[in-house]
Every structure is written in C-alpha cells, then in structure tokens.
C-alpha cells in the first residue's frame, strides 16, 4: 500500500471538500484512512438515484448519529442538492463531513450551497516522488504520476481511456461546451503550449474559435482540475516583464498522451519540456500539501531571460534544465533574476549528478532535489 502525503487529521473536527482530478486516488485514500466512517458512494447508480429523487433522505438517514460522527460522501457534485441537507446536519447535529469530488464546476455553475465557508478545501494530486519507495524518473516522465498510469503495465491504453471518459462524462454530459470536436482540438493545441506562456489569440486561430472562447476553455480545464495556470511574477520596477500566465496540464502523462509522445529520449526538446513539467507538478503538490500561503509563479523578461519557478515573494528562484552537465550559459536567467531580487535563494535542478555551487547558484540533481523538497523543504 502506498501511503499518501495529503494530510487530513484522523480526528477531524471540521468538514472539508476533498477535490482531486479523476483517478488521483481519492476514494482509495479515504477508505484506507477512515475505515470506520459512514461512506456514501454517489457513483453507485442506485444510491445516486435515490438521493437525487429525495435529498431529504440523507437527513433521515443521519439525524440520529452522535455529534462528531464522520460521514464521507464520494462525488458530491453528482447530487449537489444534498449540500443543503449536509449544511443542516452540520448545523443541527454536529456531524463532520468529507465531501469528495473531481470537479467544483458543477457546484459553482449552478450556485449550489457551498456550506458558507464551513468546509475548507483540500486537494489530492497525482503521486509525488516521496510517496513511491522506488521512484522511477523515466516512468514518471513518460506516463505521468496518476496512480493507475504510473503503476500500469500498459499505461497507453489507460491514458487513452482517461481522455475519452473526461470528454464524455465531464464535458459532454454536463454540456459545458457547444462543440465537443472543437474542444477536443483545443485539448491538443493546449498540450502543444503546455508549459508555455498562454496566447489566447494564437490558440483561437488554431482552433477556429474566438479568443474569449479559448479563455473559457482554459477555465473549464481548471474547474475540472485537468489543468492549472502558473501566473507571472511581476514585482519589479527595473525591467519590462511578461504578464500572461503559463498553462500546464495537471499531469505530464496526460499532456504526453495528447501530444502522441511515447518513450521520451534524454537530450530531446520533448524530454526537456516533460522534465520541466514534472518538477512544476511536484512543486505545486508540495506547496499545497504543506499548506503554504506562498504562490508558485514564473518570471520572464521581454528581453528573453526567464526563470521557470518562483516560490513566494521571490524567496526562491528555480531554473529547470534536463541537461546532464550544468554550464555557465544555463545560469543566465537566474543571474538576471538575482540582479533584480538579490535576496533570493537560487537553484538549478537538472540531470547533472554532481551537486555543487556555481557562485550564488546551487546546482541540484533532480532526485536529490525531490528528496530535499519533501524532507526539509527549500
């Protein structure tokens, strides 16, 4: 059994929304961590049907339970009308809920009761390196870190099914877009720009839609947890900076599949993009799991110098290179950044196995970086 890092107290006092993309392992995680809870699975069509027809059945079922009883409702967005009953049970009976879902969009879109701030959000991500005893970097770069894909003998088939199910159940059945074929084309174009600065106009031309529609498509990807934007760090008075965010799919395996990448080879541009994506993916999960208030951003000057990851208010700047030997030319972006933010801690993460300092810049092998990240932080 792989132990997940996502921290939810065994003695839970406050209710939570547990969000995570499909197949991140939410149900398995909750069943293992809270085996004695009352568990309601709304993916069971019979159970879903009964609660859909009569949401008050939940109150009747639970109103005689003791104060502090833990109730898990899996895939609450399937029957969001239950949230009124949940709110009532929390207020009147003192029950504690974990409300699980792979998309917050259904709740936002229809204006359902989100419990008035009485349940705080927690996110479960794909595997991170520290959760896997014999972490395989190449496996992660090729197929991503979703549990069924990383552990599978035939991940290609599973990745294909993943995208098909996403389009059918998250997009088509919820009528989130008018033209499913256009949206599918957008998914592929978005994969081509994975890790790049978003340009809605260029993507709109490639997809044959308006720039506003492209912006809405990106919102759908974020709300259904299939992707995320990384904002630009722009706090400076010294130079002109790029303002637009970058976009990443939530898991590198999904991006690879959309781009029809198979076995990635070190030294290629494709490998470099995937390598960077994996590090960004790991940093995002780390910040969330440690409940940090610091933001993940990137920095890019109009003159071309850039830094792939900035943590917090320029506390740490990280360049990510899939090279096997760090050379002075790889440090240009960090040096330019340091001239504007001299107090920043500077790191370059790479495949170079020799950890060392080059001036003020620390060179760290990727696996050592991951170990440090989860053991002592950065």
Label every PLM stretch briefly.
Residues 18:
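Hydrophobic anchor at the beta1->P-loop junction of P-loop NTPases
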Residues 26-27:
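Conserved lysine of the Walker
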Residues 1-11:
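Pre-Walker A adenine-sensing motif
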Residues 72, 96-102:
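Structural recognition of the conserved hydrophobic beta-strand(s) that form the central parallel beta-sheet
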Residues 158-315, 322:
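Accessory nucleic acid-recognition modules appended to NTPase machines
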Residues 40-70:
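Short glycine-rich substrate-engagement loop in P-loop NTPases that contacts/grips substrate
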Residues 353-378:
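Domain-level recognition of nuclease-like catalytic cores that cleave nucleotide substrates
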Residues 105-120:
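Short regulatory helix/loop adjacent to the ATP-binding pocket of P-loop NTPases
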């Amino acid at each position: 059994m792989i132990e997940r890092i996502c921290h939810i107290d065994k003695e839970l006092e406050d209710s939570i929304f547990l969000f995570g993309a499909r197949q991140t392992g939410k149900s398995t995680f909750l069943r293992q961590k809270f085996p004695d809870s009352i568990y309601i699975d709304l993916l069971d069509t019979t159970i879903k049907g009964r609660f859909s027809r009569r949401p008050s059945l939940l109150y009747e079922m639970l109103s005689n339970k003791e104060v502090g009883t833990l109730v898990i409702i899996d895939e609450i967005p399937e029957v969001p009308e239950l949230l009124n009953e949940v709110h009532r049970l929390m207020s009147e009976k003192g029950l504690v809920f974990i409300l699980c879902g792979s998309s917050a969009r259904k709740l936002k879109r229809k204006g359902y009761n989100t419990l008035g701030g009485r349940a705080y959000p927690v996110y479960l991500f794909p595997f991170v390196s520290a959760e896997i005893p014999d972490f395989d970097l190449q496996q992660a770069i090729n197929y991503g870190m979703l549990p069924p894909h990383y552990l599978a003998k035939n991940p290609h088939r599973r990745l294909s099914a993943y995208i098909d199910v996403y389009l059918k159940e998250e997009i088509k059945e919820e009528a989130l877009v008018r033209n499913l074929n256009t949206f599918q084309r957008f998914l592929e174009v978005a994969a081509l720009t994975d890790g790049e600065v978003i340009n809605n106009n260029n993507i709109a031309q490639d997809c044959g839609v308006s720039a506003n529609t492209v912006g809405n498509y990106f919102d759908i990807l974020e709300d259904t947890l299939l992707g995320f934007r990384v904002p630009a760090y722009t706090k400076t008075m010294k130079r002109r900076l790029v303002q637009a965010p970058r976009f990443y799919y939530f898991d590198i395996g999904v991006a690879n599949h959309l781009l029809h990448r198979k076995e990635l080879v070190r030294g290629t541009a494709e490998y470099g993009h995937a390598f960077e994506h994996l590090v960004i993916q790991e940093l995002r999960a780390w910040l969330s799991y440690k409940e940090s208030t610091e933001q993940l951003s990137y920095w890019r000057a109009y003159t071309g110098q850039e830094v792939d990851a900035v943590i917090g208010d320029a506390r740490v700047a990280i360049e990510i290179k899939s090279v096997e030997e760090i050379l002075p030319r790889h440090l240009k972006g960090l040096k330019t950044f340091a001239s504007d933010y001299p107090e920043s801690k500077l790191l370059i993460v790479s495949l170079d196995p020799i950890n060392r300092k080059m001036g003020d810049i620390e060179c760290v092998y990727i696996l050592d970086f991951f170990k440090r990240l989860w053991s002592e932080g950065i």
